[in-house]
Amino acid sequence: MWQKIKDMHMEKKRSFRMLLIMELCLLVAGVIGLFGKDDVYYFDSHEMVSSVGGYSQEKEGYFLDESCGAVSGAVKLGGISLPRGVYTVSLYYETDTFMGNMCNMTDLAPQYKTFLCNGEHLYEGLGVTDFQVWVLKDKENLALTVDYGGTGYLLVQGLEIAQSNALSRIFLFCVILGALSVNACYVYVMYDKTYVIDRKDKNILAGLVLVIAFASLPLMVDGMQSNADLVFHLMRVAGIKDGLQMGQFPLRIAPEWQQGYGYACSIFYGDTLLYIAGFLRWLGFSLITSYRLFVLIVNGMTVLIAYYCFQKMFRDKYVGLMCSAVYTLSIYRVAKLYVNGAFGEACANVFLPLIVYGFYRVFTEDIEDKKYGRAWIPLTIGFAGLVQSHLLTGELTGLFTILLCLAMWKKVFRARTFTVLAKTVIYSVLSSLWFLVPFVDYMLRGDFVIQNVAEREIQYRGVQLAQLFSVFFNRGNNVFYYNNGLSDAQPSGIGIALWLPLVVFVGILYFRKTKGLSSKDLKVGKIAAAFGGLAMCMTLLAFPWDKIQFLSSISKTLVSSLQFPNRFLIIASVCLTVVCGVVMKWAMNTWGQKGLVTCVAGIVALLLVSTVYLMNDMVYNNSGYLVYDEECIGSGYVAGGEYLPYGTDASQLMYGKLNYDEGIEIADYSKTGLNIDLTCRNLGQQDGRIELPLLYYWGYKAQDAVTGEEMQVFKGTNNVVSVVVPSGYEGQLKVGFESPWYWRMAELVSVLVVLGLGVSVYIQKRKEMSGHEA
């Protein structure tokens, strides 16, 4: 294909050259726009007005206390004019409450979506806000308002609004992305005119676009689907953005999480695909836009990868398309993505078809075929992707991989097969070493909440049998069906588009109508049906998880980590998608074109009455969640707090909270992310300690800024970073997080392995292509 495109000599076409010139002009304009966006607007407290507070000449600001009562708009500043751009709003204040007061900006002459702002809560010990506003049209009548909560005191001292070049960065990014898209469409149209693209391929392309569009329907409303895990994952996105801004790559500890104490979520929970959303947020997009684009990209990746894998397995593009549709629009995937906001499992869904396809090749292809030696590629990408996206799904997949290898044990020990499987393990581990080494290091070295939940039972969180075979699902909130029944239940099933093909396949076997299937497809169908059925059974309330859990200490840890048995539906979904493909092949081989049309029409109808029905309920019965900037949701939410050092009282983690022994004096204190600079001296006769507003994780170091002398760092009260200051010491201390050398070495190994494997596969492909041409 690439040679045919070269033969078209696009560079000689006048229209294409004009298109490139236009794109170049836009690129130049975008680059120029990056400069000169650094205006700063200052407003002192004299320009503000207050309906209840008194002005303090001594502290140069408006002072409010409990005698004022709770007042909305207690302090105001109007008449703010800002040109189009993205700004950081810094209100300088003092308060003794936590999230009791609020600062916001509003447009007094509002126009739809021309001014985006959520504001920020005010915190004791912080002293300045840091929220963003998006001014998408020149504004002349903006206002700042400060709401007083009625408790404690509040002193409002001044305002600073700093412009950034974020809009220009967004424009440049959109120009680059738009240019690539337009050029691709142009080449496609010209290719069609020159060579005439096969109608079947056009149908497939249109079908894939439609599936992506339908999978993204909930994104086509104003707002995000509010759900249990959404805030947690939005915090992860914000953490990646903050880490990138502060030069931390890859992200290990989110610097702003937990009131600036930091949270090591990224060490335990892979962020690989989530870096897409983090990069978009860092680029300047609002949090909601970054979320939407990320979900759209994940939907696209799921559709395309599933299509590639299933059409390769079943050797038919239409079967691949319909399997991709059934898998992407499966009830469990849609519910997890939109109802639960489970980004980790949504990312895991991207890679599962690669693992299924990889094992299909390993156990069905001719081992003498030259291509057999490359069967490790989809398996390696799939397993590495799972490990770096969602370890729990990796745990489930590992269990079923063991079962599959036991079932196929004779083939496993063939020399070439064993080599392929060994390569999969080795390359998956090496390419994931950058994530696995810190993870294992902390699990062995530390003591975290996640290591102390082995007694948590999961069986009572199982699903009812009726849920597995339900047809119509509604968006609900109830996830505990053992005593609440199915009233207001969350969608926890596989959907009729997956269980009906299973019923048909069982009927084919029962009535011995298997002539329409090859022995290979029949065996694949049997294994997929068995594994899918087993996975469904493991989600039920009746499955004896409690007995299994307490068999040993290992089973305790593994079972409790699952949290919800319905996680096995992710395995059931991909297995039953394979069954659906087998049934389609049977129908096509039995009835020809009529069988294909019947299957396509039937699958579309089933998806409409199940998944699209669920999406409709989600869109119309859930209020939109508009979050432009993460500052408005605070930084303290950590879901179950699994990655906190065990025993930490998160409610005591307050901004700027310093504790130090008697005899120690501190001056010139400053904190940026995970780095603290301070000048101190110890006048005492003994070594003293300073407890800093950083949560203790292995990797923090403290040293003298001049001599480089290292100070002892240890876990202090409430698991915060504590530094030992020797008696008589006087100087400047620098404290910060630093990845150990072996973490960095693991990162280098992963990069080299991925690059090496990529180059090796590319060279091998080129050699094969050269051989075919010769």
Positions of PLM-derived features:
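Membrane-interface transmembrane helices that cradle and orient dolichyl/undecaprenyl
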Residues: 355-375
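Periplasmic/ER-lumenal interhelical loops and adjacent helix-loop junctions
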Residues: 420, 427-511, 630-650
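Active-site-proximal, structured, solvent-exposed surfaces of multi-pass membrane proteins
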Residues: 195-197, 651-774
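Active-site lumenal/periplasmic loops and adjacent helix-entry segments of GT-C-fold
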Residues: 213-351, 358, 385, 392, ...
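Start-transfer (signal-anchor) and selected internal transmembrane alpha helices
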Residues: 1-37, 166-218, 514, 525-526, ...
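Perimembrane helix-loop-helix junctions
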Residues: 396-429, 508-517
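Membrane-interface alpha helices of multi-pass inner-membrane proteins
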Residues: 375-390, 425-430
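Membrane-interface helix-loop junctions at the exits of transmembrane helices
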Residues: 29-36, 212-223, 242-252, 285, ...
